[in-house]
């Protein structure tokens, strides 16, 4: 649903995500580091059947295409899904949980080529004491020295069904270029903004950029 001046517009069909099915959860992430967010949708189990899962890659500005690998289709996972760089190689991996009688909990490693895997930046938003108490904060990345927006993420600690989001927000950074980071923390009737300019993603391989923000 896209919010317009006339109300809400359903664009699912034209974007290629209007798949007739039943789902438990979805998870957005730029798993290929092209600068656009991609979509994983987890099919539910019910009525004696299992609805298939979908991994949809964003192509250009207006299309998603189905790139679901057999490794996902064979798992028949449902319910939980979250993206996380568990092996700290720069790209996002996918953790899945299910409701089958014999149990399913798959951890799928993203095998993005190393030269592209490190075209990324993870940002962990902290409070003034260094604690992760800033859910709801907005993180924006700009091409360094410009107002060209590369992406926006929200610090999310609770989304997902049978899953919890990883607290660092993850950005694909095409070309691994330097970026300016802007963090907005809402609370107490105001919006506090913190900026760090000229961040080189290569300096944060295998770790997150940790940013302490002002008191709300």
Language-model region placement:
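Short, conserved, GDST-rich strand-edge loop motifs in beta-rich repeat architectures
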Residues: 42-49
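Acidic/hydrophobic-patterned starts of short beta strands in beta-sheet-rich repeat architectures
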Residues: 33-42, 89-97
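Beta-rich catalytic cores
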Residues: 22-25, 51, 77-79, 103
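Beta-propeller blade termini
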Residues: 23-33, 79-88
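Short loop/turn motifs that recur once per blade in beta-propeller domains
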Residues: 9-22, 65-76, 130-131
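Gly/Ser/Thr/Pro-enriched helix-cap/hinge segments flanking short amphipathic alpha-helices
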Residues: 63, 69-74, 82, 88-216
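Disulfide-stabilized cysteine-rich extracellular repeat microdomains
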Residues: 5, 13-16, 31, 45, ...
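Beta-propeller blade repeat segments, especially FG-GAP/WD-type strand-to-loop junctions
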Residues: 1-11, 49-66, 102-118
């Amino acid at each position: 649903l896209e919010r317009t001046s006339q109300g809400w517009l359903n664009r699912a069909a034209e974007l290629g995500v209007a798949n007739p099915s039943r789902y438990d959860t979805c998870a957005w992430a730029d798993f290929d580091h092209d600068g656009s967010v991609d979509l994983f949708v987890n099919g539910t189990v019910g009525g004696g059947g299992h609805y298939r899962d979908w991994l949809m890659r964003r192509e250009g500005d207006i299309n998603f295409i189905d790139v679901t690998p057999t490794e996902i289709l064979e798992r028949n996972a449902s319910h939980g899904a979250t993206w996380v760089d568990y092996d700290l190689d720069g790209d996002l991996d996918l953790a899945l949980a299910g409701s089958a009688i014999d149990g399913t909990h798959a951890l799928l490693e993203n095998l993005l080529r190393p030269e592209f895997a490190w075209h990324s930046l993870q940002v962990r938003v902290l409070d003034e004491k260094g604690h992760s108490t800033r859910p709801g904060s907005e993180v924006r990345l700009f091409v360094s020295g410009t107002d060209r927006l590369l992406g926006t993420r929200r610090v999310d600690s609770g989304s997902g069904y049978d899953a919890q989001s990883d607290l660092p927000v993850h950005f694909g950074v095409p070309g691994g270029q330097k970026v300016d980071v802007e963090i907005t923390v809402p609370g107490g009737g105001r919006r506090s903004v913190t900026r760090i300019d000229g961040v080189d993603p290569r300096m944060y391989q295998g770790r997150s950029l940790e940013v302490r923000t002002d008191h709300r």
